Amino acid sequence: MIIGIGTDILQIERLQAAYDRTKGRLAEKILGPDEMLVFQHRLARNHKRGIAFLATRFAAKEAFSKAIGLGMRMPMAWRSLQTLNEPSGRPVTSYLGTLAQFMQEKNWEAHVTVSDEQDMAIAQVIVTQKIRGSDE
């Protein structure tokens, strides 16, 4: 059963400006620990791709907060949702702290997709009720 759907789109240039204005602290505020490692690696290899990664993760967090219907307030916090990639490239969510407990208690799971193209980043999240007794 679908609980909620959320979408977010943003101009990468605006995120770049905020990143520059905060001297990089924006990434520390937004990204979870595993996302931060990926971001730092990508940023070191290619600055533009690193910022695109940050933008897609920002969009995923915004879309997720809309899908669960609570906005950006507890149990949702910037760093408590991580969007990581499986070896195949498929994006998957992981939860930290209070959000992990919230998702487990509700028996919800999130399905996420992210994309970026030159100046825009987008994410869509669908939150569903897990079927009891299912591993999926």
UniProtKB/Swiss-Prot annotation:
UniProt keyword list: Cytoplasm, Fatty acid biosynthesis, Fatty acid metabolism, Lipid biosynthesis, Lipid metabolism, Magnesium, Metal-binding, Transferase
Highest taxon in the source lineage: Bacteria
Catalysed transformations (reactions): apo-[ACP] + CoA = holo-[ACP] + adenosine 3',5'-bisphosphate + H(+)
Alphabetical list of Pfam families matching this protein: ACPS
Residues binding Mg(2+): D8, E62
MF term (GO), any: magnesium ion binding
Coiled coil regions in record: none
Compartment(s) of residence: Cytoplasm
InterPro entries reported in the protein's UniProt record: 4-PPantetheinyl_Trfase_dom, 4-PPantetheinyl_Trfase_dom_sf, ACPS, Ppantetheine-prot_Trfase_dom
GO biological process, one term: fatty acid biosynthetic process
Gene Ontology cellular component list: cytoplasm
Listed EC numbers: 2.7.8.7
Swiss-Prot/TrEMBL cofactor(s): Mg(2+)
Function description: Transfers the 4'-phosphopantetheine moiety from coenzyme A to a Ser of acyl-carrier-protein.
Classification via HAMAP family: AcpS
Family (UniProt): Belongs to the P-Pant transferase superfamily. AcpS family.
Name of the protein this chain belongs to: Holo-[acyl-carrier-protein] synthase
Species in which this protein is naturally found: Polynucleobacter necessarius subsp. necessarius (strain STIR1)
